[in-house]
Regions:
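Acidic (Asp/Glu) and glycine-rich low-complexity loops/linkers
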Residues: 3-119, 123-137, 143-154, 161-172, ...
Length: 214
């Protein structure tokens, strides 16, 4: 599992560019070197299968290291991974995305394909996504705008704000508020256990169920 500030950006070329910047809290240079040796981030490149693997050796000293990772990939790339604690940004890519995180604030921008994002804690901002999108959050908010995708959202504790969505929407909330505006598609299905719902300018077949709330 990787943690830190992570930026993944697509580009028109065929090459891959990776920069890892580590800042260490230590009482001496010797201690800092020891911490870095035991917290290395290994990068594996399989040219035949066209796969790049980034894996951290140990998370023992995560509380003493602040990492910044910048990864530039070809536009047509698939991403699969697990992230511990981070600020994550993914943009300008086409492919399949399967991300699991523990505590992550994420920004997904200009992505196209099959997008599946799961986080235990943290907020998700999704902008200009297309394809098939599923966003699952245990505790946090989801903000979706200017997207053309078939979208499924699942939140246990948090709010959903959607503005300008073209495509089918299925939204499930255990506890929280749902605000939707400017949606157009075959179906808009909203399920809320406890919370409130406000919809404006909906051009979809609307099916809303609220157990407790309005």
């Amino acid at each position: 599992k990787i943690n830190g500030v992570i930026n993944i950006i697509g580009h028109a070329g065929s090459g891959t560019h990776l920069i890892i910047d580590n800042k260490v809290h230590a009482f001496s240079n010797k201690n800092a070197i020891s911490i870095l040796k035991n917290s290395q981030i290994n990068v594996y490149h399989d040219e035949n299968e066209k796969i790049i693997r980034i894996k951290k050796v140990s998370d023992k000293y995560d509380h003493k290291i602040i990492s910044k990772i910048d990864l530039h990939l070809p536009i047509n790339s698939n991403i699969r991974g697990e992230i511990k604690n981070s600020d994550l940004s993914i943009s300008k890519l086409r492919g399949t995305f399967a991300i699991k995180s523990e505590s992550t604030d994420s920004k997904l921008t200009n992505l196209s394909g099959d997008i599946n994002f799961n986080t235990k804690g943290g907020n998700i901002i999704a902008n200009k996504l297309s394809g098939s999108v599923q966003l699952n959050v245990i505790s946090g908010d989801i903000d979706i705008f200017d997207c053309s995708s078939n979208t499924i959202t699942n939140i246990e504790n948090g709010n959903i704000i959607i503005n300008s969505l073209q495509g089918k929407l299925i939204s499930n909330t255990t506890l929280g508020e749902t605000l939707i505006s400017n949606i157009e598609g075959d179906l808009c299905e909203i399920n809320i256990n406890v919370g409130s719902l406000k919809i404006t300018n909906c051009k979809s077949d609307l099916n809303a169920k609220i157990d407790i709330g309005n």
